[in-house]
Amino acid sequence: MAYVTMKGMLETGVHFGHQTRRWNPKMGTYIFGARNGIHIIDLQQTVKLFRTAHDKVVDTVARGGKVIFIGTKRQAQEAVQTEAGRAGQYYVTNRWMGGTLTNFQTIRKSIDRLKKLEVMFEDGTVNRYQKKEVLRLRREMDKLNLVLGGIKDMENLPQLAFIIDPNREDIAVKECRRLGIPIVAVTDTNCDPDLIDYVIPGNDDAIRAIKLFVGHIADACLEGEAMRKETKAENAEEAMKQAAEAEAEAAAPAAEESAE
């Protein structure tokens, strides 16, 4: 189990919220107190709520679902891209394009264009064009890859979203809620927890805190994937066993007739 620990959260500053004047009163239940004008998050609740969120991620992936990691703020970009990639999940780190989920069929056209350009550069087709046109196509490909690179293999909508800073990713939150996609989010003291299905109260600005959460959620995805493969193997083995038994039962009458 890849649960976060109290020690790990204290070391990475997960307990530091925003200035008290910038708080969202709805987060009051997750706040331990204040120190020097900064809200302090109740890490005992964070430990408990992270376990719930972690288990949701494991269950989702174990059932064959996919998770989309969303973190476009500078502090989150590297961790989100690295860890989501390690876990084989989707991610968005540059800019959330409106309609990424709610208008996915249109977004797919841009993804198809990106894949077509990548093939052109890989197989040398692009060399048929003049240098100026090649440069234009390269810029187009790089621009599309920057925004869509993390979801270019997404054939269907994800079954779960993991978000760093739901305030910043408000459009993504709205799209998920509209489509009924559950949201797991690192939710700081200035956020609205009512919009989140699985709240993880914590610092969503400190790089080390973000890395801690993103890494553990990626581990949860890998744990779920291992469970999925194990279940698949067990089901295949059981199917083969049942087929062998059925074949033996079918052959039994013929064997009896032959003996007679």
Curated annotation (Swiss-Prot):
UniProt keyword Methyltransferase present: no
GO biological process, one term: translation
GO cellular component terms given for this protein: cytosolic small ribosomal subunit
Biased composition (Low complexity): 241-260
Family matches, as Pfam families: Ribosomal_S2
CDD domains: RPS2
UniProtKB keywords: Ribonucleoprotein, Ribosomal protein
Molecular-function annotations in GO: structural constituent of ribosome
InterPro entries in alphabetical order: Ribosomal_uS2 (IPR001865), Ribosomal_uS2_bac/mit/plastid (IPR005706), Ribosomal_uS2_flav_dom_sf (IPR023591)
Claim: Secreted is one of the keywords in the record: no
Biased composition (Basic and acidic residues): 228-240
Region Disordered, annotated ranges: 228-260
Stated family: Belongs to the universal ribosomal protein uS2 family.
Protein name: Small ribosomal subunit protein uS2
Lineage of producing organism: Bacteria, Pseudomonadati, Thermodesulfobacteriota, Desulfovibrionia, Desulfovibrionales
Gene that this polypeptide is encoded by: rpsB
